[in-house]
Design a protein with these regions (language model features):
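Long, charge-dense, solvent-exposed interaction surfaces that engage phosphate-rich ligands
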Residues: 1-22, 26-33, 44
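Helix-rich C-terminal "collar"/helical-bundle subdomain used as an assembly and partner-interaction module
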Residues: 28, 32-156
Length: 156
């Protein structure tokens, strides 16, 4: 049997990286309910790594922040590109991603609520979360991540 792209996506979506990028997408899409729901799930079950091992939320903090940072960088590049050329497909290519239908759909949803000021707000919240952990010595990474979500909450 052959393994198709969708099969790979299905497996990846249940991996640690998949959950981390789902969290990042929720943050960038302004969906704080989904972001908090994912944190609750991760806190309870951990992130499942490729080998089946579960990674605790404490150990997953860096992975979650890295995924958010990576998606913020891509989204900012797309926003910047679209200022000059309003072609989403070309903007996605310029950001280093492949413009498949799911990617385009996700980015359209994201861009409907995420502008340059929201990107700046997320970057400031990433910095604050890192400061909470590394400088201020907060021990509860679940609390740090919840505060991160509240800081980037998109008000209607």
């Amino acid at each position: 049997t052959s393994v198709g792209e969708q099969d790979v996506r299905d497996v990846a979506s249940h991996s640690a990286e998949g959950s981390a990028f789902d969290f990042a997408d929720s943050v960038l899409s302004g969906d704080s309910v989904s972001a908090l729901r994912l944190l609750t799930k991760i806190s309870r079950q951990g992130l499942r790594a490729w080998g089946g091992k579960r990674v605790s939320i404490r150990d997953a903090f860096a992975l979650l922040m890295s995924a958010v940072n990576s998606e913020v960088t891509k989204t900012a590049a797309i926003i910047e590109f679209m200022v000059h050329t309003p072609d989403l497909e070309q903007a996605i290519k310029a950001s280093g991603s492949r413009p498949s239908k799911p990617v385009i759909s996700k980015m359209q949803k994201r861009l409907a609520v995420c502008d340059a000021s929201h990107i700046n707000k997320i970057n400031a919240a990433i910095l604050q979360a890192e400061k909470n952990l590394k400088v201020e010595g907060w021990r509860d990474t679940t609390h740090i991540l919840e505060m991160f979500v509240f800081r980037v909450l998109k008000r209607k």
